[in-house]
């Protein structure tokens, strides 16, 4: 099935897994800094399903309400028990001190409760920034002409869609110093975090 019309975007989760297996295509994603990294593997002689999957990921993703309810509950419980995790609490304080920006503050319980599955999906799509900014790193023996045609077909229209993916505004730095200090402890020289989604 192609993406447009009766495409990958309309498949259920189980059907999508079966479709992926039949087409030998897999995808994983993670957030790194301000970027969302998508890793897609497909057959060298048939890369098209890989682009169909990227298109589906950006334009047709949904979040099941029941799953979102359990994620919400987990976040609320984590918020309530933050005092029991001093390392996380310290990292959060360091984050808030580093940036003079309200977005660094932890969400309150009532804010998490008001967040819907649709809101979560919209936030997820924000991570992609502008589709014009998508950078491809191709590993494999595939002709450039073939790739350009696929990129144009499956991703070229996304930036002109009805729901553009707006880029988020970068956080405002509170200080130009190399490090900030919280409770007489210095910030680590480098801190790198990864989230698997």
Can you name each region flagged by the protein language model?
Residues 1:
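His-Asp-centered metal-binding catalytic motifs of divalent-metal-dependent phosphohydrolases/nucleases
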Residues 113-117:
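A conditional alpha-helix N-cap/helix-loop micro-motif detector
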Residues 19, 23, 57-60, 150-161:
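Conserved short hydrophobic interaction patches
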Residues 48-50, 67, 149:
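Solvent-exposed, non-transmembrane alpha-helical starts
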Residues 14-22, 61-80, 143, 162-176:
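Acidic/histidine-enriched alpha-helical segments
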Residues 105, 130, 135-197:
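An aromatic/glycine/proline-enriched structural segment found at the starts
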Residues 4, 11-59, 72-80, 85-112, ...:
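M16 family metallopeptidases and their MPP-like homologs
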